[in-house]
Amino acid sequence: MRIQLLLVATLVASIVATRVEDMATFRTEKQWQQDLQYRREFVKRQLAPKPKSNIVVSHTVSCVIDGGNMTSVWRFEGQFNPHIASEVILHDTSGLYNVPHEIQNDGQVLTVTVKRSAPADIAKVLISLKPVQLSSGQYECRPQLQLPWVPRPSSFMYDSYRLWYEKRWLTIILYVFMWTYLVTLLQYCIVRFIGTRLFYFLQRNITIRFTGKPTYNLLTYPVKG
């Protein structure tokens, strides 16, 4: 029993020591957001200009609808190879695969201009440009841009950050071991003391019921009468 108590005390001391060490390095959510922004800028810096690679850093969209005509302009900033004109494909949901468009490219700025009528059956216009996919709703030229290499903050990412970068997983492992040990110890106590007494109590009552004589043992006393 002394060894078991010593083990419990050791586990509790380890958990307390781990928590104290983590307090100095724990970062708030605001600090984590700043670190995430720094990592975004670091990724952008790592995307150095390379030949034959198209990289999108930022973009702007403008749209003008005059009567039944729609003029939309997508302006991308980054790095684009001279053959980007053959890699940009526009299509919509009405079945028209290659939407007529104009492309201007100076290597750092790519401008895609679409001039066409906007009938009711036009649901959206997609621009296939790696690694970007743009979409616009009906009579709307404000596509949503999603860059796959820019992470979006979420509670799951923040919890994972705390677990792995701040060594919180050690605390969780210690908690699991501690609670497993406590449950096992509680089960042992129940079986060793309460279960044994209950067994002898039932055995004594059965013996008295069928023989009329009480059974003497170290845990119970004979019934008088």
Swiss-Prot record:
Transmembrane segments: 171-191
Signal sequence bounds: 1-17
One of the protein's GO biological processes: symbiont-mediated perturbation of host defense response
Topology in membrane: Single-pass type I membrane protein
Keyword line: Disulfide bond, Glycoprotein, Host endoplasmic reticulum, Host membrane, Immunoglobulin domain, Membrane, Signal, Transmembrane, Transmembrane helix
UniProt topological domain (Cytoplasmic) ranges: 192-225
Topology, Lumenal side: 18-170
Glycan attachment residues as annotated in the record: N69
Pfam families attached to this UniProt entry: CMV_US
GO terms under cellular component: host cell endoplasmic reticulum membrane; membrane
Disulphide bridges, residue numbers: C63-C141
Record keyword Glycoprotein present: yes
Stretches assigned to the Ig-like H-type domain: 54-145
Family statement drawn from the similarity comment of this UniProt entry: Belongs to the cytomegalovirus US6 family.
Protein name as catalogued: Unique short US7 glycoprotein
Organism: Human cytomegalovirus (strain AD169) (HHV-5)
